[in-house]
Amino acid sequence: MAYQIRQGRLEDVTDLAEVEAACFPAAEAADEESLKERMTAFPECFFVAEEKTEDGFGKIIGFINGADVDQQTICDEMFEDTGWHKKDGRYQSIFGLDVIGSKRRQGVAAALMNRMIEDAKEKGRAGLILTCKDRLIHYYEKFGYRNLGVSASVHGGAVWYDMILEFGKGQDKG
């Protein structure tokens, strides 16, 4: 499968909302309006995976997004309030890493994560943070993330784990 990773654009939001709805339960998924607010506030923090079609690239099959923040862990308010975004924030947060079901296990999620890690390094961030469910801890550890334990976040009524990747501490495998 041929695909490319590119910067997200405001005109992608409807497609991103469809991908998000396919990847997360309704209580956890960001809706189109929320994604539009995020894209407007921090477009530089969105990357999309686009599959090559007969007419060229165009079908969005995945994306990654999050705000730049000063905190080392994600709090629930960050998902709804774009005011937490700081252009010079110490950490790149990851609110979602989404790949449609039929395109999973083909390296798309890893390519998106590696692009976000590369971008955070280029911007001089101290590292990246995210929350994940217990079944995904091992996946994120492959990128150098460290598990900080159960998160204070109860987003969507789920149990989340705080993960951090800190550059310059021997954990950077990006």
Regions found by a protein language model. Give the residues of each.
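Conserved acetyl-CoA-binding loop-helix of GNAT-fold acetyltransferases
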Residues: V99, R105-E118
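Conserved catalytic-core motifs of GNAT/GCN5-like acyltransferases
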Residues: D68-Q71, T131, E141, R146-D162
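Helix-loop element at the rim of GNAT/NAT acetyltransferase active sites that forms part
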Residues: E18-D31, R38
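Short, solvent-exposed loop/turn segments that connect beta-strands within catalytic domains
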Residues: K52-K59, G170-K173
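Conserved GNAT acetyl-CoA-binding A-motif
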Residues: M113, A120-K133
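Conserved acyl-donor/pantetheine-binding loop and adjacent beta-alpha core of acyl/acetyltransferases
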Residues: D55-K59, F63-D98, R104, V154-V159
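Cytosolic beta-strand hydrophobic patch enriched in CBS
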Residues: F46-K52
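A short beta-loop-alpha structural element at the N-terminal edge
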Residues: A2-L16
